[in-house]
């Protein structure tokens, strides 16, 4: 919306924007720039930097125009710049709206979301597969770039299941080494191992994070159960 700001026109309040998943710092930064020009090209400031740079002589007299797309851009930049710990704290309530499974660590989920999130409210819709594997079509296993089709995917899942089951300590590094090591041993590209495993454990064409991160977060038992389901679907 590129309209002059007015409550009469239903412009969002601060509380509305927070409820829509915008960070306080991004809102303050954006609103400060609506009626004030800091000079220079820079737009993204911390609250402390804004306080230092603010100059009454640079306030504009013309009515401000509220642009939700610009605020969204500010918000995504703030999210990317946050420490992983700060983002995990901010994201956890939104993660838990979608992921009720206690064993899925919200901090690990936050780590795969941080660079891909514009607003905190975007988070829940990306995570439904963690609690429940969705019904999916086996056509998802077809990926031309990595030369994967349903036959190759079935073969790969059957080879990878015992390898994943044999991991002694289920860490992200161990899962990574298992999958990459298999690709090296099979003499194929990493994607030919990663793609079918990721589809089997997520049931989604697009996911935050790849096969390694998702398997690690789901845990051994759930990963193996989902691979079994993938094998069963592909054998039909």
Residue ranges and their predicted role:
Residues 1-79, 92-93, 195-206, 229-230:
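Alpha-helical recognition segments enriched in aromatics with Gly/Pro capping
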Residues 19, 76-80, 118, 165-168, ...:
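Amphipathic alpha-helical interaction elements
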């Amino acid at each position: 919306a590129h309209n002059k700001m007015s409550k009469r026109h239903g412009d969002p309040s601060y509380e509305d924007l927070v409820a829509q998943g915008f960070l306080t710092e991004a809102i303050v930064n954006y609103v400060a720039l609506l009626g004030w020009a800091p000079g220079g090209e820079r737009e993204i400031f911390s609250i402390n930097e804004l306080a230092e740079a603010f100059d009454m002589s640079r306030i504009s007299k013309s009515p401000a125009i509220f642009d939700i797309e610009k605020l969204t851009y500010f918000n995504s930049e703030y999210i990317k710049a946050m420490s992983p710990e700060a983002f995990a704290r901010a994201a956890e309530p939104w993660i838990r709206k979608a992921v009720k499974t206690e064993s899925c660590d919200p901090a690990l989920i936050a780590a795969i979301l941080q660079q891909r999130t514009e607003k905190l409210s975007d988070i829940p819709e990306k995570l439904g597969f963690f609690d429940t594997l969705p019904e999916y079509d086996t056509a998802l296993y077809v990926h031309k770039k990595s030369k994967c089709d349903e036959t190759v995917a079935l073969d790969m899942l059957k080879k990878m299941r015992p390898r994943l089951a044999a991991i002694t300590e289920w860490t992200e590094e161990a899962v990574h080494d298992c999958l990459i090591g298999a690709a090296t041993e099979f003499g194929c590209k990493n994607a030919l191992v990663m793609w079918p495993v990721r589809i089997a454990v997520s049931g989604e064409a697009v996911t935050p994070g790849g096969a390694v991160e998702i398997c690690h977060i789901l845990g051994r038992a759930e990963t193996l159960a989902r691979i079994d389901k993938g094998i069963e679907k592909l054998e039909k």
